[in-house]
């Protein structure tokens, strides 16, 4: 468990018995259950079949029962339980078609997108892959250097970090609206083949999904993962 920024941690889960591990795809989600039974869903950021562990990106949520436990009480090596995996937000291309892929997310919405991008590149996807990750301020972003390096190794992969304010002189970050940037990146010549993955807060996901659909992307080509915040019960 290590920090990705001031409010997000990377949690690595290794099963006690790999023979009983469920199948999963990068971008799907699982249910994480702590020793007292508190359960939350988190997206998978890596390929378990290759790495032998699961990687989750978890934001510290105000009044969040599970995140309070993770950030303040959990110790390395402590046992947790998982159920899953579920969801259709993952890379699929059984026919090896060179369709373009657009990945758009905010906050820990990067987790499934990071997994999907790596999965597509491992499968030698031939179409362009564009990933837009947004935050309100630069401190909300993470994995910028890793994604820039990935882009330098794969000419067909393009990455852009965006913030609403505070970009300053950091050349890794663009100040602007992530929805507008994503919409403007869509090529009318390939819109019929485009696959879009949107992850983040529900209002962001639902709003951008509608805009992308109205722009002409097929509904069946849009995959979404909306992250719902759950607060602790009040006494």
List PLM regions with ranges.
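Helix-loop module immediately N-terminal to the HCX5R catalytic loop
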Residues: 76-91, 181
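Short, conserved phosphate/pyrophosphate- and ester-handling motifs at nucleotide-, phospho-/glycolipid
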Residues: 27, 109, 201
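Short, Lys/Arg- and Gly-enriched loop/turn segments at beta-strand edges
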Residues: 38-45, 87-95
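Ferredoxin-reductase
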Residues: 1-78, 135-137, 164-166
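Histidine-anchored nucleotide/phosphate-binding helix
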Residues: 112-122
């Amino acid at each position: 468990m290590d920090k990705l920024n001031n409010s997000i941690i990377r949690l690595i889960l290794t099963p006690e018995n790999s023979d009983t591990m469920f199948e999963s795809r990068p971008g799907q989600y699982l249910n994480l259950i702590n020793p007292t039974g508190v359960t939350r869903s988190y997206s998978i950021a890596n390929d378990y079949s290759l790495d032998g562990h699961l990687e989750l990106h978890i934001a510290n949520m105000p009044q969040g029962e599970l995140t309070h436990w993770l950030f303040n009480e959990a110790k390395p090596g402590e046992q947790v339980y998982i159920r899953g995996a579920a969801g259709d937000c993952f890379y699929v291309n059984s026919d090896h078609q060179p369709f373009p892929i657009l990945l758009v997310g905010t906050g820990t919405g990067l987790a499934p997108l990071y997994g999907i991008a790596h999965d597509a590149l491992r499968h030698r996807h031939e179409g362009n892959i564009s990933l837009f990750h947004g935050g309100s301020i630069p401190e909300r972003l993470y994995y910028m250097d890793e994604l820039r390096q990935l882009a330098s190794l794969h000419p067909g992969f393009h990455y852009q970090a965006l913030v609403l304010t505070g970009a300053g002189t950091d050349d890794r970050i663009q100040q602007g609206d992530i929805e507008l940037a994503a919409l403007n990146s869509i090529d009318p010549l390939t819109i019929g083949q485009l696959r879009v993955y949107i992850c983040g807060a529900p209002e962001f996901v639902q709003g951008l999904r509608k805009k992308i659909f109205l722009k002409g992307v097929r509904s069946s080509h849009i995959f979404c993962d909306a992250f719902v915040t759950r607060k602790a019960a009040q006494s």
